[in-house]
Amino acid sequence: MATIHVDGKALEVDGADNLLQACLSLGLDIPYFCWHPALGSVGACRQCAVKQYTDENDTRGRIVMSCMTPATDNTWISIEDDESKAFRASVVEWLMTNHPHDCPVCEEGGHCHLQDMTVMTGHNERRYRFTKRTHQNQELGPFIAHEMNRCIACYRCVRFYKDYAGGTDLGVYGAHDNVYFGRVEDGTLESEFSGNLTEVCPTGVFTDKTHSERYNRKWDMQFSPSICHGCSSGCNISPGERYGELRRIENRYNGSVNQYFLCDRGRFGYGYVNRTDRPRQPLLVDGQVKLSLDEALDKAADLLRGRNIVGIGSPRASLESNYALRELVGAEHFYSGIEAGELERVRLILKVLNDSPLPIPTLRDIEDHDAIFVLGEDLTQTAARMALGLRQAVKGKAEDMAAAMKVQPWLDAAVKNIGQHELNPLFIASLAETRLDDIAEECVHAAPDDLARIGFAVAHALDASAPAVEGLDSEALELAQRIADALLAAKRPLIISGSSLGSTALIEAAANIAKALKLRDKQGSISLIVPEANSMGLAMFGGDSVDAALQAVISGKADAIVVLENDLYRRVDAKIVDAALSAAKVVIVADHQKTPTSDRAHLVLPAASFAEGDGTLVSQEGRAQRFFQVFDPTYLDASILVHEGWRWLHALRATLLNKPVDWTQLDHVTEACAGSTAQLAGIVNAAPSASFRIKGLKLAREPLRYSGRTAMRANISVHEPRTSQDIDTAFSFSMEGYSGSAEPRQQVPFAWSPGWNSPQAWNKFQDEVGGHLRAGDPGTRLIESQGDGLSWFSSVPRAFSPERGTWQVVPFFHLFGSDETSSLAAPVQERIPQAYVAVAKSEADRLGVNDGALLSLSIGGETLTLPLRISEELGAGLVALPAGLPGIPPALFGKSVDGLQEAAQ
C-alpha cells in the first residue's frame, strides 16, 4: 500500500497502480479516453491530466498524465487545480473539432463515454467554425455498424481487437489528425469478440447493429442481471428490453468470470427470444387450438392421468425447472435429456473435478497461469471466453520480463516492447487447426484416441507412476516430454480438456495429468469444458440419458412423455425419436421455441426464455448463478401465457393431485431443489432472496430517466394499469427502487452511476478498478478441491488405425451454428457456414477433388451429399462434419464412413 495526497487529503492506495486507476478506485473522478482497465496505459489521449507536486511545499507543480504516473508513496497531486482543469477542457475541445456533434441521432447517446467525459470537463461551447474532416464508413457485417466521423483516435478499438483479442482484420491507417480505424476493405469483422468494440469504443464509431433495427436509448430500456445461455462458461450479461422485445445485450461485470468482455455468440445471439413463431399460448393438437391457462392445465392433467410418464429434462433449462419435472414424474422416471455418451462424459467430468487434487480456475484466474496444455478442445468454438483468457495468459511472459526490469505491468506499450514476441508456453492437441494456433508454442493434430494417448504420455512423463503408453512413436514421446517439461517449469500450469470430441479417454488423460502435477507439488489448475449452459447442473442433479427415456417408451414401459425445453432430434437418431413419439399415447412439450419435437406434441406449454423467467444455472466451473426475468410479457399483451417451466410443471402436478400450488415464488422451488441434492445445497446462496432490500427498497430494473411508461399501452387502453409485481425476486419492474453504486450489491441490472452512463460506470461498483464487485462477485462455487481423491485412469486407447476404405466421423464446432438457440437469431444466421464435409488434403488428392466439390458419404446406410472443405491439418482417416448445423444428424459422430466419393453431378 502507499499513501498519496490528493487535493490535500491523504489516501491509502495500491502502490502498484497508476494514479488514474488509484484515484478511480477511491471514487474520485478523472476524465480519460485511451485508458481501459483491461488494456492498460498508453498515454495517447492526454485527457487524464493532473497536477503533480514535489512535496507539500511545492506550489507550482507540473502537469502529468495520471495513467502514466505510478501511485508511489508520498505522491502529491491535485485534480481540481485550475491549470489541470483548463488543460483537460482544452483536450476535449480539440478532440471535438472534427466530431460531428450528432448526439441526437447517435446510437451511443446516453450510453456514451465521450458525453460523460465532455460533461465532466465542463466543455460546453464550440469555438471551431471550420471544415471538419470526414470519412467513408464501412460495412462490417451483421453485428457492428461503423461511423468513423465520430472517432477521437483514442486507439482503444485496435488495442482491444488486435492486441487483446488477437484479431487481424481491423487496423489503423493514415497519419497525424487524419487516421482511419477499420478494415482494409468492407467485410465482416472476423474476430469472435468483435462485439466488444461497441463497449470498448468511447464514442459512437462502433455500435450494435442488431440494436439499430429496434433502437431505444439506454435510459428507456428495462434490464436485469442475467446469465448467458450460449455455452457453459456462465458469462454475466445485462439484457435490455423495450415494448416486450429484447433490444440488446450488454456485458455485466463479474470480476471472477467474464470481467469486461463477451463473445459474439453471447452478445448477439439473443434474437430467438423475439421470434414470432414462438409458442406464446398453450397449443393443442398440432398447434391448431389455443387454450387458456386453466384449460391447458386441465387438459394436460386429463392426458396424463393414469399414464406411465417419463420426464425428459434439459441442460438448457434451469435447475428449478428440471426439479419441477422430476417432482411431477418421480425421480425414477426423470431423465436428464442428455444423450447417453455425452451424459457419461459429463458425469466423468464432474467426478474428476470433485476428486481432483487441483482446483478449478475461474475464467479470470486462467489469465494468471504460465503454462497451458489444451487437450482435445477447440476452445474458440466451444468456450470462446476461455479462449480469450488464454490469450492473456500467454502474455504473462512479457509482464514477467518487464517486472524483472522494474517496469509496471500497466505500461502497455513498454511491456510489449520488452516482451517482443515472447509468450508463455501453450500446447494445443486438437483435431485440426484452431484459432489459438497463432499463440501456441506447439500444436499437434490427430484423431481423438491419438490425442488421448499423448495426454496419457504427458502424465507418465510428469510422474512415472502414471500408466505408460505402449507403442507410442518417438516423435509423440518427445512431444509429450516437451509438454511435461514446460508444465513442470511453470509456477502455475493449467490443463484444459472437455467432452466435445466424444472421448472419455481425453478427460481421463487430463485427470491423470492433474494428478501427476500435484504429485510433483505443482500449484496448477484443471478446467474441463461441458457442452451447454446447465450441463454441469444436470450432472449434479442426476437422471438417466435421453436414450434410456426413449427406449422406455418404445419398449412399452411408459406411454406418456413430458419434454422440458429440449429438441430430442438434436440429441439422438431421428428414427429412434420418431419411434418413441409414435409409440407414446401422450406427448407434452414445455418449451420457448418451436422445434421438430414440439411439432409432434399433443400439447405445447409456452415456457419462458431466460428473458421472461428466473432460474439457476451451474457453469463448467461449478459456479451456480441466477438469471433474472427481464420483463413481464403479459404487461403489453394479456393474451401471452408464457411462464417459467417450473411454474407450468408444478401447477400441472398440483392439478393432477388436486392439491394447492405450494411454490408461489422462485425461492420456494430453489430451496426445495437445494434440499433434494447434497451438491446443490449451495444454490440458495447464488443470489439474494426475494426479501432482499437496500434502504427498504427493491432494486430498480429501469433507469431513473425511463420515459414513456404511461404511454406504452395507450394503444390498448388509456387507463394505465399497475406495473407488474415481481414476487420472485428483489427487483421491481419499474424505475422506482434502488439504483446506482453507493450501496454494494452483487446483482446489478445495468451499469450507471451519477455522471457515468457508459459501461465505464462499472468502475463505481468495484472494490478497485478492474477488481471484484464490492459486494463480491455473483454466484457461488459448488465444487472446491478437497485433496487428491483420484486414482490413475489406466484405460489407454489403442492407436487410431481405421480399416482401409473407412473413415471416422468427428465434429467440427462453430461459434455460430453449433449452439441450438443462438442459431435461431437472424444476425447469427448470417455467420453460420453452409453444411460441409472436411477431409485431409491427402484424402482430397486421392479422390481427385478440389475445395467446394460435392462429396457423397455413406454412414450406416445413410447417405449425405455435402460440399468439400479441405483441412490442411485434419488427419488421414477422419471425416469432419459441422456439429449442430442443419442437415447434420447428431447420431453420426463417432460412427464410420464406409463410402466416400465425389457425388454424381
UniProtKB/Swiss-Prot annotation:
Domain 2Fe-2S ferredoxin-type: 1-83
UniProt binding sites for [4Fe-4S] cluster 1: 99, 103, 106, 112
Disulfide cysteine pairs (residue numbers): none
PROSITE patterns: 2FE2S_FER_2, 4FE4S_HC3, 4FE4S_MOW_BIS_MGD, COMPLEX1_75K_1, COMPLEX1_75K_2, COMPLEX1_75K_3
SMART domains: Molybdop_Fe4S4 (SM00926), NADH-G_4Fe-4S_3 (SM00929)
EC number: 7.1.1.-
SUPFAM superfamilies cross-referenced by the UniProt entry: 2Fe-2S ferredoxin-like, 4Fe-4S ferredoxins, ADC-like, Formate dehydrogenase/DMSO reductase, domains 1-3
Domain 4Fe-4S Mo/W bis-MGD-type: 221-277
Annotated TM spans: none
InterPro entries tied to this protein: 2Fe-2S_ferredoxin-like_sf, 2Fe-2S_ferredoxin-type, Asp_de-COase-like_dom_sf, Mopterin_OxRdtase, Mopterin_OxRdtase_4Fe-4S_dom, NADH_UbQ_OxRdtase_75kDa_su_CS, NADH_UbQ_OxRdtase_ferredoxin, NADH_UbQ_OxRdtase_Gsu
Domain 4Fe-4S His(Cys)3-ligated-type per the UniProt entry, residue ranges: 83-122
Keywords tagged on the record: 2Fe-2S, 4Fe-4S, Iron, Iron-sulfur, Metal-binding, NAD, Quinone, Translocase, Ubiquinone
UniProt-listed Pfam families: Fer2_4 (PF13510), Fer4_Nqo3 (PF22117), Molybdop_Fe4S4 (PF04879), Molybdopterin (PF00384), NADH-G_4Fe-4S_3 (PF10588)
EC class name: translocase
NCBIfam families registered for this protein in UniProt: NuoG
Function: NDH-1 shuttles electrons from NADH, via FMN and iron-sulfur (Fe-S) centers, to quinones in the respiratory chain. The immediate electron acceptor for the enzyme in this species is believed to be ubiquinone. Couples the redox reaction to proton translocation (for every two electrons transferred, four hydrogen ions are translocated across the cytoplasmic membrane), and thus conserves the redox energy in a proton gradient.
Family: Belongs to the complex I 75 kDa subunit family.
Quaternary context: Composed of 13 different subunits. Subunits NuoCD, E, F, and G constitute the peripheral sector of the complex.
Protein name: NADH-quinone oxidoreductase subunit G
